[in-house]
């Protein structure tokens, strides 16, 4: 999986990759509807982030979407998802959800076919994807080899897609007749799934939340550089777009027909969510934080966080 080619404008994958990134910028890190966010995040895995995926599907065709997600997460597991991800609280919380996530639509169909069959038997049977993942993780915890890692990734992709299907069918993840329980369960499963999806996407993008591209007063030797001076020495690169002015300050806008804008790129684990929120306050309402492809001086590409104009761009959906 050569993720570096995703962001090269001369690549056939560029349009698909930037379309996925636009979804990520609009939804995945927003405070909007969590079910919609989950759909958009899964869209990025199934149809946006290209990888070397023989199961890729078009935007108007649902066939193969589950296989696409399973395949991409399997590849990500092999190449990018470390033991820290699998030992982390987000993955383990999803793994140990009780009761397990089951295929609501298949349970509904089986109950109609066999109305006298005990519901708990049907639910257990249709929890097979989640239960298989648990068994494979037990083996993975013992062996930690490549084969187990790929298998865990594939099954994790299937589980995430199952959550998506449950949401889409409207039944979601209900496990009882009580509406309050249903709402609590829906939100809990979606929250856990979305946390895992975000981490997978961040890994596939090269953890852009720990990179910051700057072009204005935060640059070295400029008046506000002290706010990020502890992040270390920057790399140098460029982004494609245009610069407008908001008062005395430049505002970047991502645009496919724009110019190469020079930027400094800082990479540091100090760019925590708390640190970025403080930078959000400093930048103010004229700017919004987003991900963008950056071209380095050696011709390679990486995705970085940048503060851009708080308006729709040519890449916006």
Model-assigned labels for residue ranges:
Residues 2-144:
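Helix-loop junctions and short alpha-helical segments
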Residues 43, 49-50, 172-174, 219-220, ...:
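Short, solvent-exposed loop/turn segments at secondary-structure junctions
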Residues 46, 50-53, 165-173, 198, ...:
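Charged/polar positions within long, soluble alpha-helices
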Residues 170, 174-183, 224-227:
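Short conserved catalytic/interaction loops centered on acidic-Pro-aromatic/His motifs
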């Amino acid at each position: 999986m050569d993720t570096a080619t995703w962001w090269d404008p001369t690549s056939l994958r560029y349009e698909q990759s930037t379309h996925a990134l636009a979804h990520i910028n609009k939804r995945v890190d927003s405070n909007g509807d969590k079910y919609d966010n989950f759909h958009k995040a899964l869209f990025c895995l199934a149809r946006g982030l290209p990888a070397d995926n023989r199961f890729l599907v078009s935007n108007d065709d649902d066939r193969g979407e589950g296989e696409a997600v399973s395949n991409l997460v399997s590849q990500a597991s092999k190449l990018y998802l470390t033991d820290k991800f699998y030992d982390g609280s987000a993955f383990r919380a999803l793994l140990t959800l009780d009761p397990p996530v089951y295929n609501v639509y298949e349970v509904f169909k089986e109950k109609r076919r066999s109305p006298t069959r005990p519901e708990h038997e049907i639910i257990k049977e249709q929890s097979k994807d989640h239960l298989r993942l648990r068994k494979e993780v037990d083996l993975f915890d013992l062996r930690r080899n490549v084969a187990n890692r790929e298998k865990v990734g594939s099954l994790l992709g299937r589980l995430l897609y199952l959550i998506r299907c449950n949401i889409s069918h409207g039944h979601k993840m209900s496990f009882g007749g009580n509406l309050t329980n249903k709402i609590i369960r829906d939100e809990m499963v979606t929250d856990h799934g979305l946390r895992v999806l975000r981490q997978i996407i961040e890994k596939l993008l090269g953890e852009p939340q720990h990179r910051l591209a700057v072009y204005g007063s935060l640059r070295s030797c400029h008046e506000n550089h002290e706010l990020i001076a502890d992040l270390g020495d920057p790399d140098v690169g460029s982004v494609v777009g245009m610069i407008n002015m908001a008062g005395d300050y430049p505002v970047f806008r991502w645009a496919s027909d724009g110019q190469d804008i020079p930027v400094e790129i800082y990479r540091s684990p100090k760019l925590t969510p708390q640190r970025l929120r403080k930078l959000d306050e400093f930048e103010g309402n004229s700017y919004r934080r987003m991900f963008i492809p950056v071209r380095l001086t050696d011709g390679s590409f990486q995705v970085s966080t940048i503060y851009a104009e708080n308006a729709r761009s040519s890449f916006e959906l």
